């Protein structure tokens, strides 16, 4: 700070107290632009500057550094101000859109990307519907595969149906569950889940997976599962811990023992449960997320995404969980639908991956 403040007398002032004061006192110092002050003066744009900025905004909502620098030179402002202006402009756009101004579709784009990245709330909001649809599709497939899944679930997961019933709040969930546990159902499930793994939403995916894993595990161990499912919702982020905290731990143990020890992580257990019968690779951390994917995809190995999922798992899980928790709660249990929802976008990709 001091270096910025050319005049010692105001050194303390600028430093501790009043960045603005400094500004006012030494406008010529150039202090406003670069130094890190407690507070920066509000940047006021002239009409001509705004015209230039708006023109670029009309062209692209996300100008790259070169575009921003070019405009910054044109309007004689630091590039950082240009960047912030665009950030705020996009936010304004989004707000207008949300408040019922549907004319601008660009904001949507913006929204989804964050979703993809990690905005739990947005994602959950946006993707929850997809989750629902996924669950619907899953459930339909589930129903079609119903007899199968039921039998398979019963056979493969043992408690699966029960678990599903208990953990899932909704029928869909249960149907989904079965599918999730079963390959037939899995296709849809995987669909929902797949994408997540692929993308950052992976994280959410992970979560889902975790949930899925839990669910799966639950399927295997119906009792724990019920709790696991809910816990999962509760503590999506820490998948492992969540498993641990949840009955998952119990699953874990059982799963582990039951499954291949190689399951790597707690998540693995859940996925294990999901696919104990499946291959170990399913068991990666991802396995959680793939937990249920796994089952669907056992064939397709989720390991790939498993790994990534894992990472996200912990992180994203939280976000998604919260936002999606309510809606997803059933979904999660179901099949992380809602979590998947988060990844819905990804879902599509996942699907492909999975399928």
Swiss-Prot record:
Gene Ontology CC, one term: nucleus
Biased composition (Basic residues): 274-284, 291-303
Name of the protein this chain belongs to: Homeobox protein OTX1
Biased composition (Low complexity): 117-144
SUPFAM superfamilies xrefs: Homeodomain-like
Organism domain of life: Eukaryota
UniProt keyword DNA-binding present: yes
Covalent cross-link site, Glycyl lysine isopeptide (Lys-Gly) (interchain with G-Cter in SUMO2): 345
BP terms from Gene Ontology: anterior/posterior pattern specification; diencephalon morphogenesis; forebrain development; inner ear morphogenesis; metencephalon development; midbrain development; regulation of transcription by RNA polymerase II
Single annotated GO MF: DNA-binding transcription activator activity, RNA polymerase II-specific
């Amino acid at each position: 700070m001091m270096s910025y403040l050319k005049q010692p007398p105001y050194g303390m002032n600028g430093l501790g107290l009043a960045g603005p004061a400094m500004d006012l006192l030494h406008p010529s110092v150039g202090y406003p632009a670069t130094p890190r002050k407690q507070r920066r003066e509000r940047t006021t744009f002239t009409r001509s500057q705004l015209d230039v900025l708006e023109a670029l905004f009309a062209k692209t909502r996300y100008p790259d550094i070169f575009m921003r620098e070019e405009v910054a030179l044109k309007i004689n402002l630091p590039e950082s101000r240009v960047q912030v202006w665009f950030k705020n402009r996009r936010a304004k756009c989004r707000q207008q859109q949300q408040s019922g101004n549907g004319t601008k579709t660009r904001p949507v784009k913006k929204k989804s990307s964050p979703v993809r990245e990690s905005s739990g709330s947005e994602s959950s909001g946006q993707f929850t519907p997809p989750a629902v649809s996924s669950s619907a599709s899953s459930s339909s497939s589930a129903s079609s595969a119903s007899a199968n899944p039921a039998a398979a679930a019963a056979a493969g997961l043992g408690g699966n149906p029960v678990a599903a019933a208990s953990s899932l709040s909704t029928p869909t969930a249960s149907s989904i569950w079965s599918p999730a546990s079963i390959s037939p159902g899995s296709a849809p499930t995987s669909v929902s889940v797949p994408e997540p793994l692929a993308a950052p939403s992976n994280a959410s995916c992970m979560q889902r997976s975790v949930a899925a894993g839990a669910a799966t595990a639950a399927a295997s161990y119906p009792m724990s599962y019920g709790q696991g499912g809910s816990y999962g919702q509760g503590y999506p982020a820490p998948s492992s811990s969540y498993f641990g905290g949840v009955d998952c731990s119990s699953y874990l143990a059982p799963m582990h023992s039951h499954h291949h020890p190689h399951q790597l992580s707690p998540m693995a257990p859940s996925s294990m449960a999901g696919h104990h019968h499946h291959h170990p690779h399913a068991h990666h951390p991802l396995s959680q997320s793939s937990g249920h994917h796994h089952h669907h995809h056992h064939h397709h190995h989720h390991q790939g995404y498993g790994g990534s999922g894992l990472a996200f798992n912990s992180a994203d899980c939280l976000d998604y969980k919260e936002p999606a928790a309510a809606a997803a709660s059933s979904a999660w249990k179901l099949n992380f639908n809602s979590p998947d929802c988060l990844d819905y976008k990804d879902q599509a990709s996942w699907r492909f991956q999975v399928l």
